[in-house]
């Protein structure tokens, strides 16, 4: 969990970093901003869990159908890119990159299994503490993968398997010739999911760890009829979530209710900001980069 400052300590921190702030009114604004962020995380949590679970299930089913097995070793051999299964025209350096990525994936999954076993996670200990079992099936491994590890696994799959997963999800592949959208969107969602899980700040998108690729932006602009998107505002992440909810066949009523609640949270904070701006003591504009 994050180490939080008290509100007074946070005010000192802001003053030390060039933001003029003092008094009970500006202190209350900081409290309001924290409450706003908490409401955002509460709104987003359930939707993020739904999307993560659904994407893992879709990917798992596609992989198992491709390899006709639930063996992790069959997945490595048949569904993961490597030196041996690279297309004939693949440059030598790319083949070696595929192989190194495969090694990294195997190591990452093995570390996840070992960590789960040490923590006595029954999803894993069941298979090692039972005489009749000698291998953890893919589906059990998917249950312990973090969203970041899941994204990396997707990135290591062959382009053919990624394409099948992308189509099963319903992604628009018209601008995604290399089938990178599926794992890059997972990485983008992972940043938000981790911020929520660790109770970090989400409203100003400081959580973002990657720059969106051109296909990521083009897909959303096309599918959601947007003129522009850059993932520099929380609204862009709301759009991404709504896109996946739509792909996952969540009802229009539920998606609209989600959007209305987000708009209400935004409106409530903006109303408070405008009051403080009117009386000339608004510090939140400095913190948020402009209060509107």
Kindly give the residue locations of the regions a language model identified.
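Extended intrinsically disordered or low-complexity regions, especially N/C-terminal cytosolic tails and loops
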Residues: 1-191, 203-292
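Acidic/aromatic/glycine-rich contiguous surface patches that form carbohydrate-binding/processing clefts
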Residues: 199
């Amino acid at each position: 969990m994050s180490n939080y400052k008290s509100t007074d300590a946070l005010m000192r921190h802001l003053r030390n970093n060039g933001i003029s702030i003092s008094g009970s009114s500006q202190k209350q604004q900081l409290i309001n901003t924290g409450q706003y962020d908490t409401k955002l995380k509460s709104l987003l949590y359930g939707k993020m869990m739904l999307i993560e679970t659904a994407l893992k299930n879709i990917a798992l089913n596609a992989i198992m159908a491709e390899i006709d097995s639930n063996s992790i070793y069959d997945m490595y051999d048949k569904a993961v890119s490597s030196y041996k299964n690279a297309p004939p025209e693949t440059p030598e350096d790319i083949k070696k990159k595929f192989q190194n990525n495969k090694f990294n994936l195997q190591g990452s999954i093995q570390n996840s299994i070992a960590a789960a076993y040490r923590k006595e996670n029954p999803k894993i200990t069941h298979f090692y503490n039972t005489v009749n079992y000698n291998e953890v099936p893919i589906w059990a491994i998917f249950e312990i993968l973090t969203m970041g590890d899941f994204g990396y696994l997707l990135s290591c799959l062959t382009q053919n398997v990624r394409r099948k997963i992308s189509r099963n999800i319903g992604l628009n592949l018209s601008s995604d010739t290399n089938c990178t959208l599926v794992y890059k969107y997972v990485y983008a969602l992972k940043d938000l999911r981790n911020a929520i899980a660790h109770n970090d700040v989400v409203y100003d998108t400081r959580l973002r760890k990657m720059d969106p690729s051109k296909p990521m932006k083009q897909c959303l602009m096309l599918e959601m009829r947007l003129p522009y998107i850059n993932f520099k505002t929380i609204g862009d992440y709301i759009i991404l979530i709504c896109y996946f909810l739509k792909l996952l066949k969540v009802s229009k009523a539920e998606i609209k209710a989600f959007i209305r609640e987000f708009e209400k949270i935004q409106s409530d904070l903006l109303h408070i900001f405008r009051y403080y701006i009117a009386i000339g003591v608004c510090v939140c504009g400095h913190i948020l980069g402009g209060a509107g």
